Regions:
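Alpha-helical segment of the N-proximal tetratricopeptide repeat
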Residues: 42-72, 83, 87-94, 123, ...
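Canonical tetratricopeptide repeat
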Residues: 48, 80-83, 87, 120, ...
């Protein structure tokens, strides 16, 4: 299942979240073709294609790919369709179409109630600074979440700023051996302003088996940079970059360049920027910074 951090891509208010965002296409799109194994394979292929397009910043093409995948659903909305729809909403969010992303979520909820989609729409409402609507959706998601799903419950309480219940759920999850809970504990303490403790939790999480939240490296590195521990920050960034594009690669690469500049290692910063611009040629701010680096 998707992670809403993708959606938010860490724009911060929605950043997680919205990593990259996801949502189901409009109900009108859920029409047409049979649900054969072949069509499922086509849906999976289009989903993979759309994710790759979104990761490269081509959100228009990503939305088209997700739409094509949803058109193969034959009026059936299962976990795959919900996942694809969520990715569509995320792409719409990154296009700057916040209202359209919300509409995409609403269309799916008209067809099938889903805790994940209520969560996604709630994050979108929060980004639109409609906290009342966001909390209503978080509450709906909470009501549809199993009592055993301590991580989901903890996240929902966290988004609702009910930190007492959030801490309780996440602590219990961690006691049960769920490393994912450590990441969300770190998020909670970071947003609460206790960055020292949050960073220790992020590092605990990253030292575990197969950490999946790439943005945790970004958090730790930003803290190390603020402490002027540049070599430590570079080591952290390199570990995050080694994951490939999991939603935070662009930010990690940008931070890496900034650290080399702070170290006054302008030749390396320039070389890193050249590589960065090959991947993200439309980044106007980076292009201007490159002109500065060429003069050093």
């Amino acid at each position: 299942m998707y992670d809403e951090s993708i959606i938010l891509a860490r724009g911060k208010s929605m950043n997680k979240a919205v990593k990259w965002l996801v949502v189901v296409g409009c109900a009108v799109m859920l029409c047409g073709c049979g649900n054969s194994e072949n069509r499922k394979e086509q849906q999976q292929s289009l989903r993979t294609q759309g994710i790759a397009q979104a990761q490269s910043g081509d959100y228009d093409s990503a939305v088209q790919s997700f739409d094509q995948a949803l058109k193969l659903s034959d009026m059936q909305v299962g976990s795959l369709e919900l996942d694809i729809a969520a990715y569509k909403a995320a792409a719409e969010y990154h296009q700057g179409n916040l209202d359209q992303a919300i509409d995409t979520c609403s269309a799916i909820l008209d067809v099938k109630k889903s805790a994940e989609i209520y969560l996604t729409r709630g994050l979108l409402y929060r980004d639109a600074e409609n906290q009342e609507a966001a909390n209503a959706d978080f509450t709906e998601a909470l009501n549809r979440t199993s009592k055993k799903d301590l991580i989901m419950k903890g996240r929902l309480y966290y988004y609702m700023k009910d930190y007492t219940n959030a801490k309780s759920c996440l602590e219990e999850a961690v006691k049960n051996g769920d490393q994912e809970g450590v990441y969300w504990q770190a998020e909670l303490y970071w947003d609460s302003g206790n960055q020292d403790y949050a960073v220790s939790l992020y590092q605990n999480y990253l030292s575990g088996e197969s950490p999946s939240h790439q943005d945790a490296y970004e958090r730790v590195a930003s803290y190390q940079i603020s402490q002027e521990k540049y070599d430590d920050a570079l080591a952290t960034l390199e570990q995050g970059i080694a994951m490939g594009d999991q939603g935070s690669l662009r930010s990690l690469l940008s931070s890496e360049i900034a650290v080399y500049e702070r170290k006054s290692d302008f030749p390396t910063a320039k070389a890193k920027m050249e590589s960065y611009l090959e991947s993200y040629p439309d980044d106007a701010d980076a292009a201007r910074e490159y002109e500065f680096l060429k003069s050093r």
